Design a protein with these regions (language model features):
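FNR-like FAD-binding dehydrogenase module
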Residues: 1-417
Length: 417
């Protein structure tokens, strides 16, 4: 059974396929002399508009707000579909991929027009167009799941710097075409101009909130950093904040842990790679943040009457704000090594205070549990409507797949970025 992410990818692919078929037939975009490059450029722009806007923080929060506003008395089958809103990344990857494929057609049209002298294409347009194609292909290749996982830092750099470069070159390309096609028509009378304005604003807005803020770090062990922030932002439960020590190169998002009736928030950062390892070891007193708190998978608990949380390691962090808020009755199973020793007695006691019935499984004492079996039993005993898993990729996929195989609504991160 295909996950919603892949269904969205297929949907956008089919829509583009239909447009391509119509272009081949009734719309007559392709003939022996030329290709309708202006119409194709509009299709390209529409695809990239969707790809960029669907990743904009305000758009993401709006999507989650709409999806989680469904009343809890609505039928479960409707609510479980709405809760899959976090699969919106399928729109991003599909429209970006389709936009790149269409750009190949556009480049073909440019070179065909150059040889036939149909649109009076000049060398600057050819150079800019070729550069854009090279950048797009690089971005798409680095975003392939295996490439992204193996070369994540390089993926991030090509996605960010390459994406900015493409946007700038789109502006240059548009101005060159305007000068070639209709120099007397003001820019503001052209749809492409306004689309590029929107896309540029979408990219710039998060960076307008870039700031370096003070932090306090408590490390109960060399495996974790309990990081506190209080710089005037109190995020909502189920959101994340992006952190960086080098804003141009890499960003890492972590689930916010706000507490009711308190300002600021906390993050639970565990040693899971070079960046987090260095962060925990060096304990910086300042860090870069940008944009706004952005909704994530945990917030979908709002559409259910009862939820069962499954967490491993620092996965307790994303669960904790929901447990503290207690808007949705829930129960937690947390599997981790030596909880008090690793995360500190204060955090463990905080969880126990809000979740007296929480199942805290010490893997150092009892070994790794069969979380699927434990989750299913606890789900039935608690009479929950859904399971939310916060863990590593393989375990999250295992729990979500096995729960859904049993007909149980299940949710967890999908590692699409």
């Amino acid at each position: 059974m295909l996950i919603p992410y892949k269904r969205l990818f297929i949907l956008i692919t089919l829509i583009n396929g239909i447009v391509f078929f119509k272009g081949l037939t009734s719309w007559n975009w392709f003939n022996s002399e030329s290709i309708a490059i202006y119409k194709i450029s509009r299709v390209i722009l529409f695809n990239f508009t969707l790809a960029i806007l669907i990743r904009q923080q305000y758009v993401i929060n709006l999507l989650f707000t709409i999806a989680t506003s469904v009343p809890k008395h609505w039928p479960l089958f409707i609510r479980r579909i709405c809760a899959k809103v976090y699969h919106f990344g399928g729109l991003h990857s599909s429209s970006a991929t389709m936009g790149t494929l269409w750009y190949f057609v556009f480049v073909w049209g440019i070179y065909k027009s150059l040889s036939n002298n149909v649109y009076q294409i000049n060398n600057p347009i050819v150079i800019i167009t070729t550069l854009i194609l090279a950048l797009l292909v690089t971005i798409v290749i680095m975003a392939l799941p295996k490439m992204r996982a193996k070369y994540h830092n390089q993926f991030e750099i090509t996605h960010r710097i390459g994406g900015w470069s493409v946007l700038i070159l789109f502006w240059v390309q548009m101005l060159l075409f305007v000068r070639l096609e209709s120099p007397s028509i003001p820019l503001w009378n052209k749809l492409d101009f306004w689309i590029l304005i929107v896309l540029t604003a979408s990219v710039i807005i998060p960076w307008l909130r870039l700031k370096k803020v003070g932090i306090n770090i408590d490390s109960p062990s060399n495996h974790v950093a309990l990081t506190s922030f209080d710089y005037g932002v109190t995020p909502f439960a189920g959101s994340s904040t992006a952190l960086s020590r080098n804003p141009l190169l890499e960003w890492h998002s972590f689930a916010n842990v706000p507490a009711p009736d308190k300002t600021g928030f906390r993050l639970t950062i565990s040693r899971a790679g070079d960046w987090t390892g260095k962060f925990i070891s060096e304990k910086p007193n300042k860090i870069w943040v940008k944009g706004i708190p952005t909704a994530g998978v945990g917030i979908v608990d709002k559409v259910f009457k009862k939820v069962f949380w499954v967490a491993t390691g620092c996965g307790n962090g994303p669960c904790l704000p929901h447990l503290l808020l207690n808007e949705t009755p829930s129960i937690l199973i947390w599997s981790t090594r030596s909880p008090e020793k690793t995360y500190g007695e204060a955090l463990v006691n905080e969880i126990k205070n809000v979740q007296p019935n929480a199942i805290i499984w010490n893997t150092d004492e009892h070994g790794k549990p069969d979380l699927v079996k434990l989750a299913y039993k606890a789900y039935k005993d608690f009479n929950a409507e859904a399971v939310i898993c916060i863990s590593n990729q393989s375990l999250t996929q295992k729990v979500v797949h096995n729960m859904e195989y049993r007909g149980i609504p299940a949710y967890g991160a999908i590692w699409d970025s």
